[in-house]
């Protein structure tokens, strides 16, 4: 935990029930990022875990261009019933940041897919780093988990820290995100 500062815990009542929240401040050469963990009290030795990267447009604004907001809502609902945690990483736009994500969206509006758009503005298809999530798992002493994901990169990253069993998280496609979901499946290897 040498590069993380940990906040106190606080209660968070939600539409899904009462959770607790705790912040982890990641310190790095480019400043700091505050990541949030939303969790149920007394989760099991094999909790449900959702590793979720920030998506302002999907999570807060309800964008139909992606499946992020729906995936977060489904995860919170399941975790409230079965116990576990959401590790909410501040890695907007698969790690490119909000400003660049909006520029990528503008290219998508012109017909480019999500990967092509990222590459056109100078980024890889996915710039995220999940090592901080591993440190957070270690903080909570999680050695085994049921990971709510369709992303094989998340599975591989967390297997370095704990035994992972994948549980799928399927959000319904719509006319705005169907192409995006196809790209995630065909070009990024997502298990959809």
UniProtKB/Swiss-Prot annotation:
<comment type="similarity">
    <text>Belongs to the GTP cyclohydrolase II family.</text>
</comment>
<dbReference type="GO" id="GO:0003935">
    <property type="term" value="F:GTP cyclohydrolase II activity"/>
</dbReference>
<dbReference type="InterPro" id="IPR036144">
    <property type="entry name" value="RibA-like_sf"/>
</dbReference>
<dbReference type="GO" id="GO:0008270">
    <property type="term" value="F:zinc ion binding"/>
</dbReference>
<keyword id="KW-0342">GTP-binding</keyword>
<dbReference type="InterPro" id="IPR000926">
    <property type="entry name" value="RibA"/>
</dbReference>
<dbReference type="Pfam" id="PF00925">
    <property type="entry name" value="GTP_cyclohydro2"/>
</dbReference>
<dbReference type="GO" id="GO:0005829">
    <property type="term" value="C:cytosol"/>
</dbReference>
<feature type="active site" description="Nucleophile">
    <location>
        <position position="128"/>
    </location>
</feature>
<dbReference type="GO" id="GO:0005525">
    <property type="term" value="F:GTP binding"/>
</dbReference>
<feature type="binding site">
    <location>
        <position position="149"/>
    </location>
    <ligand>
        <name>GTP</name>
    </ligand>
</feature>
<feature type="binding site">
    <location>
        <begin position="92"/>
        <end position="94"/>
    </location>
    <ligand>
        <name>GTP</name>
    </ligand>
</feature>
<keyword id="KW-0378">Hydrolase</keyword>
<keyword id="KW-0479">Metal-binding</keyword>
<feature type="binding site">
    <location>
        <position position="154"/>
    </location>
    <ligand>
        <name>GTP</name>
    </ligand>
</feature>
<feature type="active site" description="Proton acceptor">
    <location>
        <position position="126"/>
    </location>
</feature>
<keyword id="KW-0547">Nucleotide-binding</keyword>
<comment type="function">
    <text>Catalyzes the conversion of GTP to 2,5-diamino-6-ribosylamino-4(3H)-pyrimidinone 5'-phosphate (DARP), formate and pyrophosphate.</text>
</comment>
<feature type="binding site">
    <location>
        <position position="68"/>
    </location>
    <ligand>
        <name>Zn(2+)</name>
    </ligand>
</feature>
<feature type="binding site">
    <location>
        <begin position="50"/>
        <end position="54"/>
    </location>
    <ligand>
        <name>GTP</name>
    </ligand>
</feature>
<comment type="pathway">
    <text>Cofactor biosynthesis; riboflavin biosynthesis; 5-amino-6-(D-ribitylamino)uracil from GTP: step 1/4.</text>
</comment>
<dbReference type="GO" id="GO:0009231">
    <property type="term" value="P:riboflavin biosynthetic process"/>
</dbReference>
<keyword id="KW-0686">Riboflavin biosynthesis</keyword>
<protein>
    <recommendedName>
        <fullName>GTP cyclohydrolase-2</fullName>
        <ecNumber>3.5.4.25</ecNumber>
    </recommendedName>
</protein>
<feature type="binding site">
    <location>
        <position position="114"/>
    </location>
    <ligand>
        <name>GTP</name>
    </ligand>
</feature>
<keyword id="KW-0862">Zinc</keyword>
<feature type="binding site">
    <location>
        <position position="55"/>
    </location>
    <ligand>
        <name>Zn(2+)</name>
    </ligand>
</feature>
<dbReference type="InterPro" id="IPR032677">
    <property type="entry name" value="GTP_cyclohydro_II"/>
</dbReference>
<feature type="binding site">
    <location>
        <position position="66"/>
    </location>
    <ligand>
        <name>Zn(2+)</name>
    </ligand>
</feature>
